[in-house]
Amino acid sequence: MSAEEQDTRSGGIQVIARAAELLRVLQAHPGGLSQAEIGERVGMARSTVSRILNALEDEGLVASRGARGPYRLGPEITRMATTV
């Protein structure tokens, strides 16, 4: 594996870990949180939080009531959990 491929792979792993961290924060706050609140709790830049939330929302893993939240766990999480 080339150095470039390793960098891409480790970056992919990092974003998965960050996404999982966001999901855990939302699990602890069922009423939902804004992007800013999520960023404060996980120590990530708002732009990073926004990018990850958008991807998670596209997959149904998080849901929001507006452009900036509040965000909460989405319906796909429930569907996935029922198969465990």
Model-inferred region functions:
Residues 2-84:
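N-terminal helix-turn-helix
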